[in-house]
């Protein structure tokens, strides 16, 4: 008895949908353990503003982690120490999910994330599906990366 290609395709699609649902549910459960999430976006100055916000929160007694992007992406830990992020492949907004899991395991009071998405569609995904910030910060908005 041969399996119809349509049945096989439908089964594969169903399995992928279930896997996607489980991953999304797990991610939402993980980020819900972070009491304060701040997402910094804008054309210029995101890394500096991310660092300043994180330093201010730490000075106020909150256990705060931060992540900056760019050519030298860094994690700023709860003590304010920079750690370089070694990437094995090119930058992708998907790394935000892995970092949120890492931060949640560290039991922070707050996480400050610099938006690493360039295209508006990816910025929306990064905010609405990955970070789900309590506070959004826009440093400035100028035409850039329009190619």
Summary of predicted features, one role per range:
Residues 28-34, 56-136, 140-147:
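ATP-dependent carboxylate-amine ligase catalytic core
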Residues 46-50, 73-76:
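Short N-terminal binding/cap micro-motifs at the start of the first secondary-structure element
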Residues 44-45, 112:
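Alpha-helical architecture
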Residues 1-41, 48-55:
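Short, basic phosphate-binding NTP loop
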Residues 45-46, 92:
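Charged, low-complexity surface patches
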Residues 40-43, 64-65:
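PAPS-dependent sulfotransferase catalytic core
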